[in-house]
Design a protein with these regions (language model features):
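Conserved catalytic cores of very large enzyme subunits
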Residues: 1-4, 33-168
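N-terminal leader/propeptide and maturation segments of large enzyme subunits in energy/redox metabolism
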Residues: 1-35
Length: 168
């Protein structure tokens, strides 16, 4: 069992490093502003998901890699992002306080994540595709909720997720 776990960890690392390598290659011919973005993407892809994310950008990339890997491994359906606002909020809060992100840049990152999520698809029958509005994988995100004692758990990121979903 442990050998298989180490094989998977190594495969995840290889998968992410391929994206880092591609970003560095693209940076060589990019204009300065885009080059800086691509080099930051390479830095992030060299780090996550096998090292802890420290920023919202790193956390989003980590979540995306894991989502892709789950799709590759299980040919999955209904691989929800879970209680996204709850587990991502510490990164959002820290980045807003540090000035690394604004609400608008967070919404932009989230919108891009949802658009990428919608690119994962499977070939289905025409009837199935029509009934699922062309996206039959049901990859959902959960925001807000209640605690056992009926207290709301809606937080600022819950609203930013709603804003981003409205743009997709």
């Amino acid at each position: 069992f442990y050998d298989s776990v180490f094989i998977v960890i190594d495969a995840v690392k290889t998968y992410a490093k391929r994206y880092a390598k591609l970003a560095r290659e693209l940076a060589k011919t990019a204009k300065p502003e885009r080059q800086a973005e691509l080099l930051d993407i390479a830095r992030i892809c060299d780090k996550v998901p096998y090292e802890p994310a420290k920023t919202f950008a790193e956390a989003v990339q980590s979540v995306w890699f894991i989502q892709c890997i789950l799709q590759i491994e299980s040919n999955g359906h209904s691989l929800s992002y879970g209680r996204f606002d709850q587990y991502m909020y510490p990164y959002v809060k820290a980045d807003l306080e540090a000035g690394r992100e604004t609400e608008d840049t967070i919404v932009e990152r989230l919108t891009n994540l949802w658009i990428k999520t919608l690119t994962i698809n499977k070939v289905r029958s025409q009837a199935r595709t029509c009934s699922a509005a062309g996206s039959p994988l049901y990859q959902n995100v959960t925001i807000g909720s209640q605690t056992r004692d009926k207290k709301g758990t809606v937080i600022p990121l819950s609203y930013l997720v709603l804003r981003s979903v409205a743009q997709t």
